[in-house]
Amino acid sequence: MLFFAGWGSEENLFRHPVEEGYDYLLCFDYRTLDFDYTQIEGYTEIRLLAWSMGVWVASRVFTGHSFPWQMKLAVNGTPFPIDDRRGIPEMIFKGTLEHFSEDTLARFRRRMCGSSGQTEEFLSRTPTRTAEELREELAALALGITAYGSSSFIWDRAIIGNRDKIFPPRNQHEAWQGTEIMETEAEHYETSLFSRLLEGKGEEWTRH
């Protein structure tokens, strides 16, 4: 199970059990996009899961590389992360970066989680990275997205949370034309959804 988490992620947020027989590699902190491909060589089957900004990062990392993908799932993100029609509207992204602060981060997390209960659950996982680290990561992503744009990497399925307040669902639908879409009643970050996906349960991992 190879999981590219979203911007601002860290290990504490995704300490979930995975399906028996699978190893678990979590990728986060995109201040650099360096990836050691030898870590996943030798596997006969790899499940790729990417969330939010991790969708663009994974697309960038694996374009031109072939691995034995069992399934490639994108969750609440698109290959066009800064885009008025297919991602986060450009002015919103730029405003977040230009005015980034502890207060900005707190507001973002509330919007990402969608409810006070979900926000409390998120914070109970004790995120430890500093606001300055997260600002640096967001700035690095902005530079990379501007420099490289989208890639030709093909995803098998896109999962769209109908209550997502970060990547508007309408924009996600626009971005994923030609890709199989599954809709779910979820916020941008939904603990139960990630628990299910990382455990390998549910129809999301089933080929139709």
Annotate the PLM regions.
Residues 1-44, 79-80:
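Active-site catalytic motif of lipid deacylating hydrolases and related acyltransferases
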Residues 16, 154, 165-178:
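Short alpha-helix in the alpha/beta-hydrolase fold that links the catalytic acid
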Residues 49-58:
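Gly/Ala-rich beta-loop-alpha elbow adjacent to hydrolase catalytic centers
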Residues 63-99, 127, 136-139, 194-198:
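Flexible "cap/lid" loop of the alpha/beta hydrolase fold
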Residues 102-142:
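Conserved alpha/beta-hydrolase catalytic His-Asp/Glu region
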Residues 158-160, 164:
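Short beta-strand/loop motif that positions the catalytic acidic residue
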Residues 178-208:
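Catalytic active-site module of serine/aspartate enzymes centered on a nucleophile-bearing elbow/loop
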